[in-house]
């Protein structure tokens, strides 16, 4: 999971 995308 990429929370900085």
Curated annotation (Swiss-Prot):
GO CC terms in record? extracellular region
The places in or outside the cell where this protein is found are:
Secreted
Top-level lineage group: Eukaryota
A biological-process GO annotation: defense response
**Which keywords appear in this protein's UniProt record, sorted alphabetically?**
Amphibian defense peptide, Secreted
The organs and tissues expressing this protein are described as: Expressed by the skin dorsal glands.
Q: What is the first-listed, main subcellular location in coarse terms? A: secreted
| Signal sequence interval, chain numbering | none
Function field = Shows neither neuropeptide activity nor antibiotic activity.
Q: What is this protein called?
A: Rubellidin-1.1
Q: Which organism is it from?
A: Litoria rubella
